[in-house]
Amino acid sequence: MLPSVGAFITPNSHPIDWVLLKVVLTGSLMETSDAKGNFTTVDWRPSADVMERLGSPSTFSADVQDIALFQREGVILIRGLFSDWVDPLRAGLQRNMDHPDDYAFPCDSVAPGGGGRFFDSYCNWHRISEYTDFVSQSAAASLAAQFMKSSRAQLFHEHVFCKEPGTQTATPWHHDLPYYCVDGRQNVSVYVSLDATPAETAVRFLAGSHKSGQLYFPRHFVDGSDYIQDDVGMSSVTRLEDNFREEDIRAYALEPGDTLLFDFRTLHGTTDTPIKTRRRAFSTRWLGDDMVYCERAGETSPPLEDLGVTPGTPMPESLFPTLWHQTAKK
């Protein structure tokens, strides 16, 4: 039996070591395809000190018709909701990009020879002060609870994105739930646009796809390949994407501060239309009442391990803080 990768990786190992070591151990580049960009040499876990200093979220009163639309289509746009947070979040994201190895799970998803830059990173909400302030002081938690129809909003993680001018890398059609070690129906991503973005290069959503009951293999952003998952209940979305009806696609021109809410099960992606101006976004992932830990039959992203919980139980509050309770509403 081959030794595990973890037996050779030290806290100071560079991310590329993970790829090279996996090739050595498995003797196959194909075996590394389930790990593209899913590395960190920085501990993703928040410290107890940070958890104790979290602020008090502000409130948001959601429109009942907006909630109904979200529940029906799995996505909704709210204009200008977080305009006041654009500058701080841009500043935090810039530090994240300038010093990627100082933060958890940095990833560049432009294939060799491709132009531009497609950067993303996640699980740094407790390391970057602007991210911390947003998740703990903004109305995002209150907003999330209402759209999930949940009595509480538990932070799963944040996820930041930047596509630089010249990037022509499509984000492959996918939905987020199969990437995650959680399961359930009460969930939402709160995606804040940090730049003006034309509809042709914005994220596109397949309305109603969250209701299909079908899970699709996660996909690598760098080349669109499926993760290696041993789950007979999943299928490949690549078999379907050419048949999506245009009338079911939701794509919006965005301004800084505009906010998209979408279900973890809603299929979404982008075209490979060249990026002409920066496209940055800050997304937070929220868990509601019925969300529980689950063990996927393969790699997850983020690859969160040693959580100390059993399948079917809630995610631990010590790592994933509940930032909004229904009783907190005034």
List each language-model region with its residue ranges:
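Non-heme Fe(II)-dependent double-stranded beta-helix
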Residues: 21, 27-72, 77-173, 179-180, ...
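Short, conserved beta-strand element in jelly-roll/cupin
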Residues: 181-198
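Double-stranded beta-helix
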Residues: 199-267
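Non-heme Fe(II)/2-oxoglutarate
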Residues: 31-34, 39-45, 49, 53, ...
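A short secondary-structure junction signal
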Residues: 167, 171-175, 184, 200-206, ...
